[in-house]
Amino acid sequence: MAKEEFAREKPHVNVGTIGHVDHGKTTLTAAITKVLAERVGGAAEQTFEAIDNAPEERERGITIATSHVEYETENRHYAHVDCPGHADYVKNMVTGAAQMDGAILVVGSDDGPMPQTREHILLARQVGVPYLVVFMNKTDLVDDAELLELVEMEVRELLTEYEFPGDEVPVVRGSALQALESSEEHEEKIMELMEAVDEYIPTPERDVEKPFLMPVEDIFSITGRGTVVTGRIERGRVQLQDEIEIVGMQEEKMDSVVTGIEMFNKTLEEGEAGDNAGILLRGIEKEEVKRGMVLAEPGTVTPHKEFECEVYVLSKEEGGRHTPFFDGYQPQFYFRTTDVTGSIELPEGVEMVMPGDNATFEGSLIEPVALEEGLRFAIREGGHTVGAGVVTDILD
């Protein structure tokens, strides 16, 4: 009897290409899939045209064009996102539609850093893309070695300016187009780039390993048994008899113990990240719990009202506002499972925010929510989405 082929489970990492328009992000993405398909195998090559023709997705009421490709190195399996337009990058990074554990910053060696290079680095810093690796593309168009040195220096300084370790970030030079056209020299550069990505971007901690958190979606009372809270477990694991805290929508936390876990009407010993579960809580009345609260491992989350955020405001064409908003604007902030009213304070020197803009400002909620850096939210008016954002700092 033939033995089953040994399939090693490689660790999975999410990455993407970022950088200025026409510096070669999509060409590089295609080149990576081609070179790795030929040299490592595992996933098929994707053409430039297939990647460039990005399908549209909806995330938090926003339409975003994104291409997803996958490829493998000897050590890892990668999911890679590439966006056709600048606005798609902004939306993608702000909504977290495509979570990135690290990104490849593509800089045209002929141009050097350009306005969107800077903007993408800033966005990566704001929304928490923790690691960047640089690919200096189009080196075949530059004869002057000193010019290449200068571009690398500029990129490193720019990274340092936005609090990335500019001196340590790996920088690889090559031509994605030449690699696509099977130039041995430039294929080697793609391999060198992927070695840098393998080594420099750490494997992320899986959601299951993080402290338990489940947003409350629904609450039921079961006669003789107590209160059941349902929701999708966002991270971590929960087991019978675990102590948990109920946090949000009020200043005080409540304590309880898990006395039952159900999924699809079957009882479980434990629930984990991604499960839609019903959790039976000891000593809690149905009236005490409401949507917008979270169940969490004790001591891991706290309720807050004041925060700083990075936000993308929908354009009129995307179904957003037709007019700008000003300091003191009061929308609903939709965190996890509920809307909370809040007001915004624009930074000094910013008069207003136009539809289609991305902006940084401070938000202030009327009720506390289990906020943390990196938490995504929608901004809504009368039940429809006018913006999407991410918490970049807690202020209270």
Swiss-Prot record:
GO terms for molecular function: GTP binding; GTPase activity; translation elongation factor activity. PROSITE patterns: G_TR_1, G_TR_2. Residues 61-65 are annotated as: G2. SUPFAM superfamilies: EF-Tu/eEF-1alpha/eIF2-gamma C-terminal domain (SSF50465), P-loop containing nucleoside triphosphate hydrolases (SSF52540), Translation proteins (SSF50447). It is found in: Cytoplasm. It catalyses: GTP + H2O = GDP + phosphate + H(+). Residues 19-26 are annotated as: G1. Residues 175-177 are annotated as: G5. Keywords: Cytoplasm, Elongation factor, GTP-binding, Hydrolase, Magnesium, Metal-binding, Nucleotide-binding, Protein biosynthesis. Its EC number is 3.6.5.3. The keyword Secreted does not apply. It holds the Pfam family GTP_EFTU_D2. Residues 10-205 form the tr-type G domain. GTP hydrolase that promotes the GTP-dependent binding of aminoacyl-tRNA to the A-site of ribosomes during protein biosynthesis. This is Elongation factor Tu.
